[in-house]
Amino acid sequence: MSHTILLVQQQVKKPESRVWADYETLNQCLEGVCKIYEEQLKQQNPTAPTITYDISQLFKFIDQLADLSCLEFHPATGTYVPHTKDWIKENIYALLRNQAGQ
């Protein structure tokens, strides 16, 4: 369990589109990225009773973000380690694969 800060900028050249969130664990942060996408889908489809998507659609959403990164706290060093979009995508894939296997 390590504190993780998620940094998101949705549009290029629009600093006002920057948001951040903090999570108690890395997995909560990765799930938070999925929830951001799910919220966008709900806004685009307000009358849909359910929202479904596949991982390629989620990754396309992540790729179109101007910036997405997270800072994961490492207690041993007392520092936050930055992670890129690609790292986040790899770990979301592993998380979802693990959840699907349960």
UniProtKB/Swiss-Prot annotation:
It comes from the Eukaryota. PROSITE patterns: ER. Keywords: Cell cycle. It comes from Echinococcus multilocularis. Belongs to the E(R) family. Homodimer. InterPro entries: EHR_sf (IPR035912), ERH (IPR000781). The lineage of its organism: Eukaryota, Metazoa, Spiralia, Lophotrochozoa, Platyhelminthes. It holds the Pfam family ER. The keyword Calcium does not apply. May have a role in the cell cycle. This is Enhancer of rudimentary homolog.
